[in-house]
Structures are given as C-alpha cells and as structure tokens.
Amino acid sequence: HKADGGYNIYLEIFGGGFGAGPNHDGCDAVDSMLSNCSNIPIEAMESDYPFFRVVDYSLRSSSGGDGKFRGGMGFQKAYQNLLDNVTYATYGDRFRIAPEGVLGGAPGAKAETFVERGGQVIQLESKQQFTLQKGDRLVVRTGGGGGYGLPQERSTLLKENDNFNGISANKL
C-alpha cells in the first residue's frame, strides 16, 4: 500500500501441511523451512500495517490426505481490507496439482487464494498481482500434506483422536 512518505509493505511466507511418514502423521500448518520465518502474532501485524485486519486464522480440518498416517493440515488466513488500492501479490504453489500421497495414501488439499468482493468470489492464480479495494476479504488457503499408507489401516486410536480434535478425512 502506498502511504504518505512511501510504500508500506507487508510480506508473509506461508507454509502448509507436511506429508505423513511411515510412522507418523504429517505436521500441521508448518512454516516453510527455507524461509527462516516464524508465525507473526496477529496483533503485531495489525498494529504495524493499518490497511488490513485478520478476521480468520484456522486449520483446514479436512486438508490433510487420508491414510494409515494422515497428511498435515494446511491453514486458512482471511484478511479484511480497510483501504482502497492495496496491491496484493502472491507467489504460491500446489494450486493445480495436489500434494500426492504415497503407498495408497490420499493426496492433500490444493492451495488456493481468492477475494470476496460484493457477493462475488474472484479466484486468484498461484502467481498474480491484484488490486484490493476497501471492504474486500482476501482468503489464503495453504495446502495439506499427502497421506501415507492405506486409509483402512489407520489405527482405531488415531481415528478416535481425529474425531475428538474435529479432523476429518480429506474430501476436497
């Protein structure tokens, strides 16, 4: 966003769900290992960047691929845009091809980014620049990790834990 005296730039590097392994579920909502960045507190972002507000930050409960071991869940982050003419740029991956499962595991959910504007949903590409207007709601969904092994081999205990935690099999 161009503010008085120059540009006000916010940069965030998103991770997502990691793939499952032969003995464990994938990690949920993990930052990219290559970014050396941490999860920034929402309050810090909003105090430093007055052009948006975070209105949702949640796990995508059905984004991890089903399997003997479940792929990690991605997350959703939604921003309410507070000013006109805010430029949003994205450089993402796994928008078209889902993260694959292995040895019978299901794929994780694909990533997506879209803008809700006046009752319309504007789907954005994985690599795109877009101008946001006041009142727009920007939604970023990161992908889930692929599952490992056949879903019917998932232990009863792990299924019970999934149910208790509100995690469902990937149906995306």
Language model features by range: what are they?
Residues 1-172:
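Glycine/proline-enriched, intrinsically flexible loops and inter-domain linkers
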